[in-house]
Regions:
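Short acidic/polar hinge/loop motifs at secondary-structure boundaries
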Residues: 108-134
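Gram-negative outer-membrane beta-barrel transporters
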Residues: 445-452, 570-578, 587-589, 594-682, ...
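Conserved C-terminal beta-signal and adjacent last beta-strands/turns
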Residues: 12, 21-23, 194, 256, ...
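Transmembrane beta-barrel wall of Gram-negative outer-membrane proteins
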Residues: 170-200, 210-277, 317-328
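N-terminal periplasmic accessory domains that precede
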Residues: 69-72, 88-91, 103, 118-123, ...
């Protein structure tokens, strides 16, 4: 999406708390106090851990009034790119969401459908901290951690008694947010319950493009002159505003057996709905009335047809339920957890629309037939590990289990906007996988300066029970299972110099199973029997049950430096080499696959070759005095796939900001620059051109009382 289509958002918030976090005078966002992280599954100082780590705190989230977890990550963390066109599209060191393990209180929340994370499902105001570990972590966390780990920790009670927080926020595009939290700590019990509701009418976007050459409509016919996109297609209008309505609630209950042992059950549930409203057309008749159906002649002699369905977007629905039960024994350094991520609803509906002239108002209300793709999924997992202190050695051993499944159904709807109305299924797809793992890590503190980490993980991965059925044509398939095993070693060194400087180097091997939708999902294309040959007339997307796991080797070196208590800086260089890289293959050549003739070709995920990623990351923080502090981070990244450069990655990512904190005021200003993500020959400054963009943010916080705060953010 071109930067010129990025929107400005203004929010005004009121935060009220009964002894709430929001009213407590806290240290500056960029203060350099030591931070403990869990990059090695053991407590380590941020400056000492042999990895590149960023931390986002509850105060960061509160002061910036971030509307989503993805926004908090993309705005502050080094090397993370947040897509401006999707709430959930992030990449880290060139790896996408499916290759970044995301956990909430230790529970993985990557979905079983395509491995991505719907960030809108995670209530952002309930987050205590986010730890971002960049680089391969598969030796401890498994295959989804080839790009890194994002660990989200939710809030716990810190004081006895009953406490509560209220946040009310309103902004542009009818954006509102309500957050209500209540916490109670009494004797051995901690209980935290909360509710969050977000709603927005959205903004005009997602423009409609047409290719020239279609001439099936004879009436009406109109002459028009419209602009072109970066793909040399004609922009004729748009779907309108993408309205979002999400509602979530959460419960976290902890029983403390004593100071060292506790049992915690947490649950959060989210409903997320979206729809496009108020479609618009740039094609108009002589009276200036919008046209959504007709034949369009251009001044250059080219032409195309437009249909009302082109201007109608999607109606989407998601429902998540995440359960997590954890036992922690800090004294004996034993931890165990079992969890379920149950995505009860996931999918969307669409329509071809009416094939007749229609007004904008009637098109918005049109509720004729359509289709729905519905793909709920489940992820079950278990992890337990124990740590032993053996002289100069800290030994950690653990085991883990993870299973995923999805079942996709495609329906014909009588009312394309109503998912609960009359419908009939015409396609079924699904499959499962599971992984058993054991892992071991040893930290050898050779002396007070040198620490050596060595670890290994064994994975046994199986994909099975894959199926596909086309109910209209009677074609059904079952797929053979596949089993793979892999050893994933990791080795790291950390050396402390005398002048508050730490050097580190690491190597990690990763084993990444393919996501289930790439293995077992076909993209609906009608199968017909033509003279005894099963045939698909249009191009289809096929399942690939033979898809193999990727393997990667990641190398990293870095240095971290402190100057007193006011300045910290770090530099790291990395390179990741991937074998059997999974890429999207497409051909227009007529091909027979699985006994079906695809006349116009097909698309499919395949192990196509090797990929190489490399990059540099720089981070610096400085506290001038008690009032002023600043930060800057920069990432350069590049990827080649079989020798060809991947232009979809931004080469340069820059974040910088400054904070002023005095008396009752806390003022923040920060900015982000993302370089272009397109080939050099693409025309810039047009829709669909991935131009560079620059985002600035301002946040004004005023503590009215110790329990109430006013916020204004841009």
């Amino acid at each position: 999406m071109s930067g010129k289509f990025l929107s400005k958002a203004i929010l005004f918030s009121l935060v009220i708390g009964a002894n709430a976090f929001s009213g407590v005078s806290a240290a500056n966002v960029y203060e350099l106090a030591p931070v403990v992280v869990t990059a090695t599954k053991t407590a380590e100082s941020l400056e000492k851990v042999p990895a590149s780590v960023s931390v986002v705190t509850a105060k960061d989230i509160e002061d910036h009034n971030y509307s989503s977890t993805a926004q908090a990550l993309g705005a502050t963390s080094t090397g993370i790119y947040l897509s401006p066109v999707a709430d959930g599209g992030i990449s880290m060191r060139g790896f996408g969401s499916a290759d970044i393990l995301v956990m909430v209180d230790g529970q993985p929340v990557n979905n079983g459908w395509n491995g991505s994370v719907d960030w809108g499902m995670i209530p952002v105001q309930n987050i205590e901290r986010i730890e971002v570990v960049r680089g391969a972590a598969s030796s401890l966390y498994g295959g989804r951690a080839v790009g890194g780990v994002i660990q989200i920790t939710t809030k716990e009670n810190k004081e006895d008694g009953l406490h509560g927080d209220v946040l009310l926020s309103t902004g542009s595009n009818s954006t509102t947010k309500q957050v209500y939290d209540a916490k109670i700590k009494k004797d051995k019990w901690d209980v935290n319950v909360g509710y969050e509701k977000r709603k927005t009418d959205g903004w005009r976007g997602y423009f409609i493009e047409e290719r020239p050459g279609y001439n099936d409509i004879s009436d009406p016919t109109v002459d028009a002159d419209v602009g072109t996109s970066a793909r040399d297609r004609y922009i004729v209008g748009g779907r309108g505003r993408k309205a979002i309505d999400s509602e979530s609630y959460h419960v976290k209950t902890t029983y403390h057996f004593n100071e060292d042992k506790k049992l915690t059950y947490s649950y959060f549930h989210t409903n997320y709905n979206y729809a496009y409203n108020d479609p618009f057309s740039f094609i108009k008749d002589k009276d200036g009335k919008e046209i959504f159906y007709g034949h369009v002649n251009l001044p250059n002699g080219k032409y195309f047809d437009i249909y009302p369905g082109d201007f109608l977007g999607y109606v989407g629905q998601k429902e998540w339920a995440v359960h997590n039960l954890a036992y922690d024994d800090d004294k004996n350094q034993f931890h165990a957890r079992i969890g379920l991520t149950d995505i009860k609803k996931d999918g969307y509906s669409s329509t071809g629309g009416p094939e007749e002239s229609i007004s904008a108002g009637d098109l918005q209300k049109w509720n004729g037939d359509g289709s729905q793709s519905f793909y709920p999924s489940k992820t079950k997992d278990f992890d337990m590990h124990k740590t032993w202190e053996l002289g100069q050695h800290t030994l950690l051993a653990g085991m883990a289990y993870r299973s995923e499944s999805f079942d996709q159904t495609r329906y014909k709807l009588t009312n394309w906007r109503n998912h609960d109305g009359p419908k009939s299924a015409y396609e079924l797809h699904g499959g499962k996988d599971e992984s058993w793992s054991g892992y071991l890590q040893d930290k050898w503190q050779a002396n007070n300066r040198l620490a050596v980490y060595a670890g290994v993980r064994f994975d046994r991965y199986k994909k099975y029970d894959g199926y596909g059925s086309y109910l209209d044509s009677g074609v059904s398939r079952t797929y053979a299972e596949g089993t793979y095993t892999e050893w994933s070693p990791k080795f790291s060194l950390e050396y402390a110099l005398r002048n508050d400087t730490t050097l580190f180097a690491s190597y990690g091997h990763s084993f990444t199973p393919p996501i289930l939708s790439s293995v077992y999902r076909d993209e609906g294309a009608k199968i017909q029997n033509v003279n005894g040959q099963l045939t698909v007339a249009k191009k289809g997307s096929l399942a690939n049950p033979d898809l193999k796991p990727e393997t990667s080797d990641t190398f990293e070196i870095g240095v971290k430096k402190k100057w007193g208590d006011k300045t910290f800086a770090s530099v790291s260089l990395y390179k990741a080499e991937t074998k059997d890289a999974i890429e999207y293959y497409s051909t227009k050549k007529a091909t027979i696959m699985n006994g079906v003739l695809y006349k116009n070709g097909f698309s499919q995920y395949r192990n196509l070759g090797d990929a190489s990623k490399k990059g540099v990351e720089v981070e610096a923080k400085h506290k001038f005095n008690d009032k002023w502090s600043t930060y800057v981070n920069y990432a350069w990244e590049s990827e080649d796939i079989d020798g060809e450069h991947n232009y979809n990655l931004p080469k340069h990512l820059v974040h910088f900001g400054v904070e002023y904190n005095y008396n009752k005021w806390d003022i923040l200003a920060d900015a982000q620059y993302v370089s272009a993500r397109q080939t050099p020959d693409v025309e810039r400054g047009k829709y669909q051109s991935e131009d560079s963009f620059f985002i600035t943010n301002m946040a004004f916080n005023y503590n009215v009382t110790p329990e109430a705060k006013l916020q204004f953010t841009i």
